[in-house]
């Protein structure tokens, strides 16, 4: 059996590290879902302002999701993932230091919005990697695994870990820890 055809319960073993990277990266990206809106309000912003930050992030992510496949086809999925990873890390730091750290709403929107453009470049370019490396008759299970590791990262670990970290290192410490997870997933 060739290396490209080896699977475990439909998981393409030749892409195992990519799947793990998605799970770890999305864990870090998902930390904020559990508390960021409340934290923004605790900085003195209104519920409407906190909601608008998430709306802007969602719009940026939707736009980036739309173009990520095209970009991956033009410059390769690996380069697209690298660009998304670097942008996410840089703009996460800027968001923490100058947006949240200074309670500057304009910079919060700018940096969080640009960060919203970044994660789909990293995340959805991996779908192109799957398509390029998995036989078409095996793609359904390979994509099922993709969505499973994505969901475990963002929805399970990313939402659960802050329940342990916030009492010990606070919201900002937890957001800095998110960077460590994304660095581990992106490298």
How would you label these PLM feature ranges?
Residues 121-134:
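Intracellular juxtamembrane helix-capping segments at the cytosolic ends
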Residues 8-58:
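Helix-loop boundary and gating motifs at the non-cytosolic
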Residues 58-66, 155-156:
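Residue-level signature of mid-helix packing/kink "hotspots" within the transmembrane helices
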Residues 23, 105-121:
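Hydrophobic core of transmembrane alpha-helices in multi-pass small-molecule transporters
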Residues 64-76, 166:
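Helix-to-loop junctions at the C-terminal end of transmembrane segments
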